[in-house]
Amino acid sequence: MRALRKIIVTKKGGYLFEADIRGYFNHIQHDWLRKMVAHRIADPLILRLIGKWLRAGYMVKGVVLRSEEGSPQGGPISPILSNIYLHFVLDLWFEKKIKKSCQGEAYLTRFADDFVVNFQYRNDAEEFQRNLTDRFGKFGLELAEEKTRIMRFGRFARVHLGKTGQKPDTFDFLGFRHVCGTDRGGKFALVRIPSVKSRRKFLAKTKDWLRKHRHEKQQDQQKQLTLMLRGFYQYFGLHHCHPKLNEVRLEILRQWVHTLRRRSQRHRLHWSYLLKQPWFDLPTAVAVLHPTV
């Protein structure tokens, strides 16, 4: 997040390429991955162990099925192998070939299988998209066309589009919605707030927990909801986020009220009564938890 912010705020980037890899973890090619790992590891015992891990397969109705592609999910080594795969397929290729062929500046930001690329010129972004499709195809990967786009984004995009009354697009990355905004002095500022998807996912989690534990003591419910909410605050505690975080807090309180009413069959359990109870309270979000990100 810090690296992406630095690129958007300080570098020459008026265009942003956003993409999604379709079923990435299910389409990693084992042969290619073995070659990539062997490029840095010479110990045959470790290479054999990794091969066994990849061939572990999965079980359906008591029958073990093995696959020649994909990385087994759920284990500690799977994220490492998946990251190695994209390091060779995308990262090194971008640094050694794409950046050298671009007319302007270009910067790749990747975390696991999520990535965005900032370009100074649109022609470079379009050429990259064409080359990336071919590059991924060579290694068994495919871009999700419905989630792949080139947009105007950044401080230069804001100035140019502002002349015609338009605004830059927004994009989601690592759970945050990224927006071109301004600071108090009217200068460009990157605004990041929890995305709609991340908020809905978290609220679905709290709703499900309340449904399963609606008969627990109110004090125990309050303790667990506080832990969940503080974890959410801890991740999303950036500039501009606290209004959305407090909206999430209010929605959880509504979920809690609904659960209490269902449990007691007291549909007239009013807010005025609950707000007087010492246990009916959840922590509010502070303005900034991570000021340097």
Regions found by a protein language model. Give the residues of each.
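Non-catalytic terminal/accessory segments
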Residues: 1-293
